[in-house]
Regions:
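Soluble catalytic regions of membrane-associated enzymes that act on cell-envelope
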Residues: 170-210
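Membrane-embedded alpha-helical bundles of multi-pass enzymes
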Residues: 1-175, 206, 211
């Protein structure tokens, strides 16, 4: 699933057999590298509160989960149409990452990147998990278009989630779907103490918050 020519990665020893028939170990390496750079760019705000080293440690910890994403992604890709089961692999790893450590780190779920996007309305049917699966399925379909085989399946993997998202939008915000309205004002409180366990202090943060309905 690497849409670049061999010569582009030859200098890194990633061309040839490793690129066309990657091992689970190679997939884990790709997954970790992608995850590390992703979280290093995504989480610098954490460093503003806890310092640079805890921020880097958190990014590395989050990237460790991508080892499983890459390794199992390579394994399922060996099946016929196995790449299209990859969204379930991604979702499973995302669930574990959202549960541990420190009570989970769900702020980096893929679904949050689809807010106001064409797939966001799917959350009304299956929550952020369905949005994540649909997003990864579209991505797999786009990559699979570069392959000579299974292009019809690839097109279906792109069109079906997008079509489902458009259908879901129809039922969002309609009068028939609205029971009542409420105006809410909220002031979010801070954590009692700094540190990487801030996600475990949910109840304390709620107690320090002011919510008016």
């Amino acid at each position: 699933l690497m849409p670049w020519p061999r010569r582009a990665t030859a200098a890194l020893g990633m061309a040839g057999e490793a690129q066309e028939h990657p091992s689970a170990r190679f997939g884990a390496l790709i997954g970790f590298t992608h995850g590390l750079f992703c979280y290093l760019f995504l989480l610098p705000w954490v460093g503003e509160f806890v310092g640079a080293m805890p921020y880097i440690a958190l990014a590395i910890t989050m990237a460790l989960y991508a080892l499983a994403t890459g390794a199992f992604g390579v394994l399922v890709a060996r099946w016929r149409y196995g790449a299209f089961t990859f969204p379930l692999v991604y979702l499973a790893v995302e669930f574990v990452r959202s549960s541990w450590p420190f009570g989970g780190f769900a702020w980096v779920r893929l679904a949050w990147g689809q807010i106001n996007g064409p797939l966001a309305a799917l959350s009304a049917w299956g929550g952020p998990a369905l949005v994540t699966v649909a997003t990864v399925l579209v991505a797999v379909g786009c990559v699979s278009l570069l392959s000579a085989a299974s292009r019809r399946v690839a097109v279906a993997a792109i069109i079906l989630p997008l079509a489902a998202g458009l259908i879901a939008i129809i039922g969002v915000g309609k009068d028939s779907s609205t029971v009542d309205q409420a105006r809410v004002g909220a002031v979010q409180g801070n954590v009692p103490r700094l540190g990487l366990d801030f996600n475990e202090q949910r109840r304390a943060v709620l107690s320090l918050s002011l919510i008016h309905i």
